[in-house]
From Swiss-Prot:
Pfam families on file: UPF0102 (PF02021)
InterPro entries: Restrct_endonuc-II-like, tRNA_endonuc-like_dom_sf, UPF0102_YraN-like
Entry protein name: UPF0102 protein SACE_6045
Organism per entry: Saccharopolyspora erythraea (strain ATCC 11635 / DSM 40517 / JCM 4748 / NBRC 13426 / NCIMB 8594 / NRRL 2338)
SUPFAM superfamilies documented for this protein: Restriction endonuclease-like (SSF52980)
Amino acid sequence: MSRTAIFGTLSDDDTKGRRHALGVEGERLAARFLEEHGITVLERNWRCDRGELDIVATDGETVIFCEVKARSGVDYGAPLNAVSPHKVRHLRALARTWLSERNLTGCTARFDVVSVLWPPGRPARIEHLEGAF
């Protein structure tokens, strides 16, 4: 299933600072979007020595590992296309670690991607792809 929404604007500041702000705000908007659609966010930016999971959430009995991809344009491809096979393997390994630390290894899990497309001075467009990989 795919859901889409449109949110406020982000200013067109310096490139490096803007990219960081875009990532931080994109993750915040993604979490809000998920919660508005009945998904419970458990953790944001969970870290271990091997990496980070953007959002860990639940939808009923299903644990969701959600990768957030935020971009200001599509010059380098759509945000949803930015999850490489290497990234998928890495996220799966991180999810196994997260589940193992909580003794939840037998539970149902799902991997979603939330795309935040946010051109300078324009509203953000958010798309949620359930079961992306």
